[in-house]
Amino acid sequence: SKKKLEKHVKYLMQEAGLTSREADVARLICTGLSDKEIAKKLELSHHTVKDHLKKIYAKFRVHARAQLVSLMYK
């Protein structure tokens, strides 16, 4: 559920040390949006979203979007 995901993302954000913007990007990834869609929704450049993604992947020690989504829904 959306509420459960939000609670889990907050926990993971604290544990992994995500910034609030990185957490926003992570949340939107979990909803299935593309990088370009995330950029538009958050009013960021596509490049900035990619940078956030790299940092998120590093903090969670994952290498792919599917791994991140799987982790978020655990």
Model-based region annotation:
Residues 1-17, 36, 40:
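Linker/hinge segments immediately adjacent to helix-turn-helix/homeobox DNA-binding domains
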Residues 7, 20, 48-51:
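Alpha-helix N-cap/N′ positions at the starts of helices
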Residues 17-18, 60:
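Histidine kinase transmitter module recognition
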Residues 21-25:
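The N-cap/first-turn positions of alpha helices
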Residues 27, 40, 70:
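A cross-family signal for key residues in well-ordered alpha-helices
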Residues 29-33, 72:
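Short helix-to-turn junction characteristic of helix-turn-helix DNA-binding domains
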Residues 32-67:
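Recognition helix of helix-turn-helix DNA-binding domains
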